[in-house]
Each structure stands twice: as structure tokens, then as C-alpha cells.
Amino acid sequence: MTSSDMNSNLNRLRSMALGSSSKQSDPHQQQPRASQETLNARLKLRRTPNEEHEPEHYEDLQLDFNPSLFRSLERFLPENLLSSTRIEKARAMSDLLLRYSPESERIRVQKHREYRQNILSSYQRLHEELYTLHPVSFFVPSFLDAVSNTSEENFKSIIGRAAPGIYTFDMLKPQFCQMLIAEVENMEKWFHYSKSSMMRPTTINKFGVVLDDFGLDGMLQKLLGDFISPISQVLFPEVCGTGLDSHHGYAIEYGKYRDTDLGFHVDDSEVTLNVCLGNQFSGGELYFRGVRCDNHVNSEIKENYDYSQVPGQAVLHHGRHRHGARAITAGRLVNLVMWCRSSTFREAKRYQKDFSSWCGGCKLEKHNRQQAAIKATVEVLKRRGADKTHVEH
């Protein structure tokens, strides 16, 4: 679900749930159940959000909807429900979302739940150690040293600013990269032999695996919370809000009989982590063409930066950085990608119109306005000076 879809669903839900006490959910629709006390409390949402209330974090729960939606919706819960436990609130909000979401969305949610349950109940993991974060085993020493003290000086000791909004650093050990590649291959074989259809990571990828669907979401969320979010709050404070709190994690493959390149696009993220896992390959360079907000995503290209991928090396970039991947010319290339999101930034973004702190288009417009204002002021002062001279003579 995109951020715009999430906001429209939230507005629709709010309007339908206000004052509602008689609508019943489809008895054939499986959904989370809350206690009767919670169900009674949640029937009537607030008309305006409680801005003083600090919402819970829901990223670690198995939810059918984006955790960001739960954080936004929580501000509209009645006071007596706000004092309930986090689980009770999550159940009540899940019930509301399932009741009032469009039928197509309910069907999508149900199908994805069944899809994931089928994988988790049948898939035989190849490397069990991948499913729990082991920093010493996964990361190179220089990366661990840099993040042991979350100061800007520490980060910059290993992190290079390749271009505005783009940072590179050594991150993953070769053994981890090879294990993850083998796990991805095992996932694909499982799908092939089970004769199941695979949900691909994005709409522009024909190949690749959503790692979260195979049970790696817990490990990746730990990676986000303990490492990527603290780093990003130093490097990208303008889009991290109070922290990055949810993710979409996947592996993408390039090569013969796979995707050969990746078209020009922006990610549905605040910050994106892209790590080359290997193998032997030629080509596949990443190219970046500037950070833009929604209003300027198709604006003129003035920024140009190309990056040659190195196994184990990470690229951490602004999610709104327009980018793509050039065609691979030989071998096979596998990447670990995490779209990292901030629910607090997305909530605040709804009320913003100017993003000149990070959008090249907004920055140019702001500069042009300032220059026009200076020019107009100079013209006024000139006229006043001319008028004063005329009067004196």
C-alpha cells in the first residue's frame, strides 16, 4: 500500500466509523478479534486527532496493514481505549480496518496472509542462522566500530558521501553474502517445486524474492532498529522523523534469464539500503539523478552520479533519489534491498508543502522566489531614490 493509499484509507475509515455502532463485519471474513470491552470502546472514533498522544510502535507485530497506518489511526481512538494495552489497541484497529476497508483491499489482505502462512508452514530454511541478527558474524569490523558510538564523527570515519543524498560504506562479510545468496536460491527452488506463484518485490521487478515473506522480517527489523535507523538519523535527519520504524526487505537478481537492468524510478521509502551480495558480474552500475518530492519527480535532471557496485559494500541513499541500474553485461548480480520508512515523517509530510531541505525542485523554486523578492525590493528602493531625487530638484 502506498502512502497516498494509506492516507485515503484512513480518511475513509474515519468518516465511516464516526458514530457507527450497528455495522457488522462479514461473518465469513477471517480477522483479528478483540475483547468485547475493546470492541465496545472502539466503536466511535474521535473527530479530530489527539495531537498530544504519542502512538505506540507496531512494527514488531504480525499485522495485515502497514504499521504506519496503525500509528496514525491510534490518535483518533477514544480516551478509554488509549489506556488499553498495545495488543488490545492493535486488535481493535485491525478489526476497524478490516470492517471498513474496500472489499478489494480485504481480499488482498486475506490472500497475502494465506500466501505468507503457506510459505512459513512449508518452507525448509537452508541457513537457520540468517534468521536472527548476529552482528559479529554478519558485519565487517569497521562497520561495527563505526556504529558502536552513534556520533557523526564515528559514522564519517567509514561512511563516504559519494554525492548529495548518497553514502557508501563496507558492511557485510563475504560469508554472510554467500549464505544469503544460497538462501535466496533455495527460496526460488521451493517455489519452483511447489508450483506456487511468487509475489515479486516491486511492480518493476520480474524476478527477486520478498525476504519478509519467508520469515526474515524479524532479522531485518532488528537490523533497521539497531543499525540503519541510528545511522540515518545522523545522515538524513530531514526525513527520519523520530526514527525509521518499518521496512520492506527483498533480494533482487540480475543476469541471464533474470532482470538485466532496473528502470528509472524512486522508492517508496524515506531511506533505502542497497547492498551488493555478489557474485561475479560486469555492468549493473547504479545511476542517480537527484532527490525530488512528488511534485518534482519528473523535473529536469541536473544531478548525475554513477556507482559501480562492490560485493559487501552498502549504498545508503535518500528514498526519493531518482535512480536505476544499468544492464548487467556478464555474470550474475544479487542485491539485498531494504526500503526503510518513518511513520512520524509520513504523518508530518501530509501537512507540508515545502521540501526545500531535501528536494532539488523545491530548493530551486525557493531560490527563485528569494531572487525575485530581492530584485523587487531593489526596484522599489531605486524608485524611492529616484522619487526623492526628483523632489529635491
Label the model's feature ranges.
Residues 119, 127, 131, 135-242, ...:
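Non-heme Fe(II)/2-oxoglutarate
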Residues 36, 66, 70, 90-93, ...:
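Generic preference for well-ordered alpha-helical elements
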Residues 3-13, 18-28, 38, 42, ...:
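Catalytic core of non-heme Fe(II) oxygenases with the double-stranded beta-helix
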Residues 209-221, 257-264, 366-371:
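Short, charged low-complexity intrinsically disordered segments located at boundaries
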Residues 334-344, 367-373, 382-383:
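C-terminal "cap" of GNAT-fold acetyltransferases
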Residues 91-96, 113, 147, 207, ...:
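Generic hydrophobic, helix-prone segments enriched in Leu/Val/Ile
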Residues 1-164, 358-368, 375, 379-393:
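Fe(II)/2-oxoglutarate
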Residues 122, 207, 212-214, 265-267, ...:
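Surface-exposed loop/turn and secondary-structure junction residues enriched for glycine/proline
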